[in-house]
Regions:
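Ligand-binding pocket segment of bilobal, Venus flytrap-like solute-binding proteins
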Residues: 1-6, 99-171
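Structural signal for conserved beta-strand scaffold positions within catalytic alpha/beta enzyme cores
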Residues: 36, 95, 167-168
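Short beta-strand->loop
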Residues: 64, 72-76, 80, 88-99, ...
Length: 171
């Protein structure tokens, strides 16, 4: 005799307030288990001509993704990157338009590290500024094709697509 096992995965814990554990139990006919199986780092990816290395403090990052900082030559970005040739161009922010564990983890980071700026609670759906793109592959493609853009993405997509990454995030 064999037993059928239903399983699924997520980057985020099921949210009781949204009834997610009950939905999972109904779908799988058993109580859901939370088993940490993998860790997926998140990269901040950008496409700014002539800028090879970009350092962004967490408060500056939160201001960019909330829409409070709108241009690449904003004084806060210039102060953190004094030798960079930053254009006086609009920052094109991209976010995951699908429900995403990556979005949930990124917004959790912003809220915990810069909660006075990023006041939204963490969520699988985006609450900040910008334009939506489908899934991680769509984010990677949008940033690659759009000058003066920035986003967050799974590290594996950022490295696979050889996107520029802001690897120095300072809280």
């Amino acid at each position: 005799p064999y037993t059928t096992l239903f399983r699924s995965g997520s980057d985020s814990v099921l949210n009781k307030d949204k009834g997610e554990p009950d939905k999972a139990k109904q779908r799988c006919n058993a109580d859901p288990w939370h088993l940490p199986m993998a860790a997926g780092p998140i990269a901040v990816v950008y496409n700014v001509d002539g800028v090879k290395d970009l350092t962004l403090s967490t408060p500056t990052l939160a201001k960019i993704f909330s829409g409070a900082i709108k241009k690449w030559d904003d004084p806060a970005i210039k102060k953190e990157n004094p030798s960079a040739k930053l254009p006086s161009a609009q920052i094109e922010v991209f976010y995951r338009k699908d429900e995403s564990g990556t979005t949930d983890n990124f917004t959790k980071f912003l809220n915990k590290a810069a909660g006075d700026i990023w006041t939204e609670k963490h969520s699988k759906t985006w609450k900040g500024a910008g334009k939506g793109a489908d899934k991680s592959a769509g984010i990677a493609q949008a940033v690659k094709e759009t000058k003066n853009s920035i986003s967050y993405d799974e590290w594996s997509y950022a490295t696979k697509n050889k996107d520029r990454k802001s690897t120095r995030l300072n809280s």
